[in-house]
């Protein structure tokens, strides 16, 4: 069998260099062997590593084949009858014997291929330039032009085309030729008569190839299915093409093949990912040391910053273990811009770090220059009180000219944080008109029996601080019903654990401003309780929201309202009461 397949060199011209056997493989120069893609240096073949991870691992072996020259056999063109072009006839073929032989070295052959490719590219660019000129003269074929019809390739010079800046790949030179070009090549090769019957045969072949697959729809009957009768499988590239059967309805005895686009897409994505991974690995190797140095420098620069933050938090707050308490921290947006001052830094810290409680209840003192704006704002709040009760706490006592709403933060901690000295926060108390309600023992089940002492602090015009004590008796809360007892039971106010509640009030000349809910998260679960403003309210219609904003007690305003005489009597009783809290000036 090997004798039959062996090529008979006797039929080839004896002058052909390929018919002679080389005396030695060492005659090939290193430069020529380096130009060949199939030659491998034996010294480096043992350490060969595949250039791409997509390639399969090959057996590392030495190759003793070296190429020293390239022999080219030239054949004349003939009508082929062997190929099926996309249109027309006049197929291209070659004669049975070559008419010439030429030998090249590896370098010479590469240069010859480059020259041929440049010639083909030049002809292609000249044809494109000619077609563009004809379209321009005829205005895209709408106008007839005699000058356009007389133009030929000879009229296009090399200066009109840009050959050097045109980049094409190897596949460009394997483009199919049109019918006219094929017929011209055959006549130039000496073919005098072109068989026209080939044209009809090729048309019939193309038509038969266009009609592929069976004509079945959904179901395939083996007796009528053309694929089954031909003994081939039904093929489905997309829905109903070329075969119209489904996977469940196909009864072809030969089987069925279905194109899976998801599988092809998955394979494509995996291949792209592998190539990207390989590319990233190659790029990361030279820059690995630089990245390590940048990371170390970045970590060293970030280290002291994190330490300073922890240090500032630790020094800004003093935490003492006391029974559980709830503290409300209030902070205005304007105080964020004044962190340079020590007093405002403490206020900012208590608002930012909600997990750490501060026993110094922060207050905002009113400014004399802002009294007119405060009065106008409080009047608007009283008008919208029925519609917007409990929506948000609006602080009317700002330290700046602009009045902004204040957020409220409810903080729970393991103990109540208290300062060692009240003199540290004396600046807050000196300029404040805040009411402080100290509940020493809140026992669930007895909310109607309130006998604690309360104190109200007002600032005298000359700068001294006076305390006006008063005692709140159970008669002052006539509508504190049983429903309120169950709402504020042991689940929210543990027994024997004191709590601090901060409520902001206005000045003596201002109307009562509704305070925000201290416990907004329990607003929907607790009943609404409202107390009448018996000290600050100028009229019987003014209300101060207590604890949770709106109240259902508003349906009985007659019971909550107090006359002017009762207010004066109550004020006298408050003066006679002993002072509970003393704040140093």
From Swiss-Prot:
<feature type="region of interest" description="Disordered">
    <location>
        <begin position="335"/>
        <end position="395"/>
    </location>
</feature>
<comment type="function">
    <text>Binds to the consensus sequence 5'-AGAGTG-3' and has transcriptional activator activity. Plays a role in apoptosis.</text>
</comment>
<feature type="compositionally biased region" description="Acidic residues">
    <location>
        <begin position="368"/>
        <end position="389"/>
    </location>
</feature>
<feature type="compositionally biased region" description="Polar residues">
    <location>
        <begin position="41"/>
        <end position="52"/>
    </location>
</feature>
<feature type="compositionally biased region" description="Polar residues">
    <location>
        <begin position="351"/>
        <end position="366"/>
    </location>
</feature>
<dbReference type="InterPro" id="IPR031972">
    <property type="entry name" value="CSRNP_N"/>
</dbReference>
<feature type="compositionally biased region" description="Low complexity">
    <location>
        <begin position="30"/>
        <end position="40"/>
    </location>
</feature>
<keyword id="KW-0010">Activator</keyword>
<keyword id="KW-0805">Transcription regulation</keyword>
<feature type="compositionally biased region" description="Acidic residues">
    <location>
        <begin position="335"/>
        <end position="349"/>
    </location>
</feature>
<keyword id="KW-0539">Nucleus</keyword>
<dbReference type="InterPro" id="IPR023260">
    <property type="entry name" value="Cys/Ser-rich_nuc_prot"/>
</dbReference>
<dbReference type="GO" id="GO:0006357">
    <property type="term" value="P:regulation of transcription by RNA polymerase II"/>
</dbReference>
<comment type="similarity">
    <text>Belongs to the AXUD1 family.</text>
</comment>
<feature type="region of interest" description="Disordered">
    <location>
        <begin position="1"/>
        <end position="52"/>
    </location>
</feature>
<keyword id="KW-0804">Transcription</keyword>
<keyword id="KW-0053">Apoptosis</keyword>
<keyword id="KW-0238">DNA-binding</keyword>
<dbReference type="GO" id="GO:0001228">
    <property type="term" value="F:DNA-binding transcription activator activity, RNA polymerase II-specific"/>
</dbReference>
<dbReference type="GO" id="GO:0000981">
    <property type="term" value="F:DNA-binding transcription factor activity, RNA polymerase II-specific"/>
</dbReference>
<protein>
    <recommendedName>
        <fullName>Cysteine/serine-rich nuclear protein 3</fullName>
    </recommendedName>
</protein>
<dbReference type="GO" id="GO:0006915">
    <property type="term" value="P:apoptotic process"/>
</dbReference>
<dbReference type="GO" id="GO:0003700">
    <property type="term" value="F:DNA-binding transcription factor activity"/>
</dbReference>
<dbReference type="GO" id="GO:0000785">
    <property type="term" value="C:chromatin"/>
</dbReference>
<dbReference type="GO" id="GO:0043065">
    <property type="term" value="P:positive regulation of apoptotic process"/>
</dbReference>
<dbReference type="Pfam" id="PF16019">
    <property type="entry name" value="CSRNP_N"/>
</dbReference>
<dbReference type="GO" id="GO:0005634">
    <property type="term" value="C:nucleus"/>
</dbReference>
<dbReference type="GO" id="GO:0045944">
    <property type="term" value="P:positive regulation of transcription by RNA polymerase II"/>
</dbReference>
<dbReference type="GO" id="GO:0043565">
    <property type="term" value="F:sequence-specific DNA binding"/>
</dbReference>
